[in-house]
Amino acid sequence: MSVRQTTADVVVVDYGLGNLRSVTRGLERAGANVSLSEDPAEFDAADGIVLPGVGAFSEGMDNAGPFREALVEQAEAGKPLFGICLGMQMLLTTSEEADHEGQGDAEGLDLIPGKNVRFSRDQTVPHMGWNELDVTRDHPLVEGVDSVGSKTPRADGTGGSVDGEHAYFVHSYYAVPDDESATVATTDYGTDFASIVANDAGNVFGTQFHPEKSGETGLRILRNYVDYCLDH
């Protein structure tokens, strides 16, 4: 009789951008065995991969260039891939961030079809601080999230806003998936934007906010990710 694995081995991609220490600590609190890696060959043995990131989209994609092929291959093979903040934006097809610098749209990993766009000039950027999540559909990443400081869910039993003191954001661009079904949760900052996204298969997902800095809700999401890695 086989013994069920109880600890997920998670690789955090070290491509030179991102708050690696806080992400690592958050995942460890969530029960993962975490390793930082600059070697795509180490993805094979991992139960899951986390792509963190803070900074400019173009720089992120340039730095992640050596990882690109391996990330796409692992994701297409069904391995759980979790993008955080810039890492979430990199999961999409393009970003207009470089276009504001006169360079045209920058290409992402194209694992979730869509584009990253800038908040309107009427909004103060970056969007920084605590804000609410409105869970719009089921996904393993948000299982139980509505029960953590939640407001009243919809009549059909789905959705509900998480108390705004549980999701911490720092960003000037936001994801616009081509397909609305890719949106798992939204947040209002002058406009409703996708704050959690996932691909059709469900194994590639991202949060625009930093779960490792988002209190009990963030910890719940990280635990859900670790559980997902163990189950898949």
Swiss-Prot record:
Which residues participate directly in catalysis?
85 (nucleophile), 210, 212
User: Which interval of the chain is the signal sequence?
Assistant: none
Q: Name one GO cellular component term.
A: cytoplasm
Provide the alphabetized UniProt keywords: Amino-acid biosynthesis, Cytoplasm, Glutamine amidotransferase, Histidine biosynthesis, Hydrolase, Lyase
Catalysis performed (reactions)? 5-[(5-phospho-1-deoxy-D-ribulos-1-ylimino)methylamino]-1-(5-phospho-beta-D-ribosyl)imidazole-4-carboxamide + L-glutamine = D-erythro-1-(imidazol-4-yl)glycerol 3-phosphate + 5-amino-1-(5-phospho-beta-D-ribosyl)imidazole-4-carboxamide + L-glutamate + H(+); L-glutamine + H2O = L-glutamate + NH4(+)
Q: Which GO terms describe its molecular function?
A: glutaminase activity; imidazoleglycerol-phosphate synthase activity; lyase activity
What is one GO biological process annotated to this record? L-histidine biosynthetic process
UniProt subcellular location:
Cytoplasm
- Per its UniProt entry, which superkingdom is the organism in? Archaea
Q: What is its EC number?
A: 4.3.2.10, 3.5.1.2
Domain Glutamine amidotransferase type-1 span(s) in chain numbering: 9-232
Q: Does the keyword Methyltransferase apply?
A: no
Self-association state and partner proteins as the record states: Heterodimer of HisH and HisF.
| Stated name of the protein | Imidazole glycerol phosphate synthase subunit HisH
Tell me what organism the protein belongs to.
Haloarcula marismortui (strain ATCC 43049 / DSM 3752 / JCM 8966 / VKM B-1809) (Halobacterium marismortui)
Q: Which gene carries the instructions for this protein? A: hisH
